[in-house]
Amino acid sequence: MSHKPAHLLLVDDDPGLLKLLGLRLTSEGYSVVTAESGAEGLRVLNREKVDLVISDLRMDEMDGMQLFAEIQKVQPGMPVIILTAHGSIPDAVAATQQGVFSFLTKPVDKDALYQAIDDALEQSAPATDERWREAIVTRSPLMLRLLEQARLVAQSDVSVLINGQSGTGKEIFAQAIHNASPRNSKPFIAINCGALPEQLLESELFGHARGAFTGAVSNREGLFQAAEGGTLFLDEIGDMPAPLQVKLLRVLQERKVRPLGSNRDIDINVRIISATHRDLPKAMARGEFREDLYYRLNVVSLKIPALAERTEDIPLLANHLLRQAAERHKPFVRAFSTDAMKRLMTASWPGNVRQLVNVIEQCVALTSSPVISDALVEQALEGENTALPTFVEARNQFELNYLRKLLQITKGNVTHAARMAGRNRTEFYKLLSRHELDANDFKE
């Protein structure tokens, strides 16, 4: 059974039963926090965002119904499921009349419990449609605040610049903004500005006329036209070549696009969301990124935190991703061992969510057990340390190595090195600046 990701609070004064129920629900993909008394449960609610409370009925000091009453004072509408070994039909009727979502008798049938949880979460969902952000699995206060900002900015047409390390999910965030916007019925189109050569990127963005270049055998509309009425997502905008930055600025200023090889401007109605892992103010200081373009793109700035900055999301994400991978490949895989989850929680995650996805895919591919072991997670993490870099990362590393070799050969002579590279001195100095190389360091 597939369940909606949710954060559950379990309250029971029996530590053994509390642990058992917590393990069962965690194995189903829920994020769980526990409390051994009603008072402790209220303290948890004060410090954490919880989607649903499951409480035992009979507890010392504060029973389940008293806890329910206190919860409704501080969080009206919070769904509560009551479990009891001493239930009766009158008790159940009385509880539901007071607003308890469900009243289940112990020992609880697991399918009945899962169904009650799913029904409670479905019926207690906010009136506003949250499907716009369903691909973003989080309970991190940092991310939830960011999502609220995204929801607000989605209602206008201002340009948004998303900052964040590689693998943090910038494109998914851009898609969420589009989904929450009035443009959501129109196309969302993404392009990586650092993954294509300059002429090909120009043709992709702006289109081309027949005969514009060798191989242009017919007219072709660009992505600005393809995204008409919708959103164009410019990923890795910091890697866009300087000549195209000028053309992009003109498009943003005039709201018109001119295909390559054409003398005709075409009106466009497109919202721009861009993203980068680079420090664009530093790139501007080095002359690599246009200041006027930066301010056009950066009307609203959103910074996505690294996975290491929101470790509370790791169990939720890991279980969600495990469920997806298992459904595709091995449905018998159900959960992580306790030690495996601890290892996931303490890993450094330089590749962020993208790396977590890869690790879990590897674990599912290699396991023959319903439970992912700590040893398997360790093996997958070690494999990630030698994994292939992204295309942009590989290209940047090649450029760095190539420039170092040129400067070594020419003993720091920039004119000679630029000539060997087929670049003019200005372009070559920009390359050196981008990679923070000083030709003087190579002079003898």
From Swiss-Prot:
Function: Member of the two-component regulatory system GlrR/GlrK that up-regulates transcription of the glmY sRNA when cells enter the stationary growth phase. Regulates glmY transcription by binding to three conserved sites in the purL-glmY intergenic region.
Sigma-54 factor interaction domain ranges (all copies): 136-366
Compartments reported by the entry: Cytoplasm
Name used for this protein in its record: Transcriptional regulatory protein GlrR
Superkingdom assignment: Bacteria
Predominant location category: cytoplasm
Result of knocking out the encoding gene: Mutants show decreased amounts of glmY.
Binding positions (ATP): 164-171, 227-236
Misc note: Not required for the regulation of the glmY-glmZ-glmS regulatory cascade by glucosamine-6-phosphate depletion.
GO biological process, one term: DNA-templated transcription
